[in-house]
Amino acid sequence: MATSKTLFFNVKRNEPQLVVAEKPTPNEIKQLSDIDDQEGLRFLLPVIFIYPPIVGGKLDPVKIIRDGLAKALVFYHPFAGRIFEGPNRKLMVNCNNEGVMFVEADADVELKRLRDGILSIWPHVEEFMCKVEDCGGIIGCPLLFIQVTRFTCGGFILGIKLNHTMADIYGLMLFLNATSELLKSASTPSFPPVWQRELLSARSSPRITCTHYEFDELVSDDQNPKDNFIRASIFFGSKEIQALRNQLPTNPILSYSRFDLITACLWKCRTIALEPNPRELSRVSIVVTGVLCRSPLTYALDLVQQAKAQASQEYVKLVADLLVIKGRPKYATRLNYLVSDITSFRFDKFDLGCGKPLYAGVPLATSTISSYSNSKNDKGEDGVFVPICLPSLAMEKFQNELKKMINCGLISKI
């Protein structure tokens, strides 16, 4: 049972089913790349789509989505397979058409009663995702866990957990677009899938030619096991973005994007809230925390732009080389902040034949990772939704720092 302030509701899940490709597919083994099978990607990535009531109310989203998956898996057949480990824990996918997990569910509440503004649904987001038992969701498990939850009003939520070693958000978008196109009578997807994982593998003679701070082994990754982490969300609309721009010089030398402004703001507020040793290193790129905390926003902005400039094809190859040479080192988590901007993928325009979603994106953050999604606030204003996750003591300080920057607090806490 879940609660929303004084509202109680139940989500009844049916027994899980396996959806397979509707036509025979190649039975083969495909090797993942050195980037794919790194330790830092061995997790399930949650994605959620919230849809209003279907016009006319006669279409069943469960049947529509289940049928579309069976069609799309004919072309994206590796998604219906299973990951296994080869020698040296190398990940491979057995394309055996065992299928993706699919759960039909019903919530005994109207969608509009569950939320005070669309973003307040997040405390209950796990109710709309498949429960993943025992296997941990990576080795020998379905590569997609999908749940469709219908509401009494006719609205529904599509919740997906994606094995991140198999694909990223862009790969999932292509798969879902294929699902939509095939449901609308297309004979093939407009963007046929291409494997080519060798493009993300180490070179025949791997080499390390630069410092990779994101895998820095000299930095302690220890976290206090007693830390009580809190999840929350922030909405950056035009008012918040303008508040950040107002802190820039009158005639800035550089042009800063919305992504730059949001990332610099969150990075600085987060670093101050975590109260690190002023001489420690804080990373979106590399910087001494004391300097970041006391410097103006433009200092963080310039470092964000430097970090973006480093993300070249050559750098990806260098990362693959390092992963092979050093045996898949884990991401450094101490004062490391990873951000992913998926606003350009326009998940909020994704139509399965049931209309466009009210919200679509990655709904939850980890202690080190946040994703930026397009969204609307409860006033219908367009903006960017950002989930965050911090220790409870740091969250209060983070909110205070955020108010100083944009005169706005957190939207919701989980």
Regions found by a protein language model. Give the residues of each.
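A common structural junction motif
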Residues: 179-187, 404-413
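Soluble acyl-CoA-dependent acyltransferase catalytic core bearing the H(X)4D motif
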Residues: 2-29, 41-78, 82-347
